[in-house]
Amino acid sequence: EIRKILKTHNPSLVLAAMDKAGILSNILPGTTHKNIPILVHFENGNSINWITRLIVLGGADPTNTLRLSNKERREYKNTLKAIRMGNKPSAIAFEFGEIIANSYALAIAALTESAPPRDLEKQISIGSSLEFPIRARDLNSLQGKQLGDTLKKLKSIWVKSDFTLTKKDLMKNLNE
């Protein structure tokens, strides 16, 4: 099973052989093993995540082909969503948590063939520990969709500021 192969310490040779024999693309259409050795190098024996490796293989969405648990399916989809967002690892950690942020950073590094940030662990730790300073009760004049849209807008502004804006700064944005 592909999951077992991707969970091994270094699946590069097995995946290369499967790719050369046409087995890999038969199981997972459109995939290629070429970035897996790079990912394995960046993992450095730590944080082996078979979902990250699955994403780095590329190809068509495997969530209907492979038997994934709901948690694995969510992790796969959220990591892809994070890759499309293209934010700093701290912003991804804030939005999705540590696991997705780590997968995101390693996948991007492997796919772009460039090292992940040196302070990756620090960025992820910071992002995952942050709490958005605005609460719905702070915007008690708003309700329903307007409240949700405003919170979303303010959160986006806060993330783009690299989490530097204070509650007071964010509240000023309401009047602009």
Model-derived features: positions:
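Generic amphipathic alpha-helical segments used as scaffolds and interaction surfaces in large
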Residues: I2-H9, R67, S141-L142
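C-terminal subdomains that position terminal phosphate/3'-OH groups for nucleotidyl transfer/ligation
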Residues: K20-E176
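Loop-centered beta-sheet repeat module
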Residues: R3-K20, I27
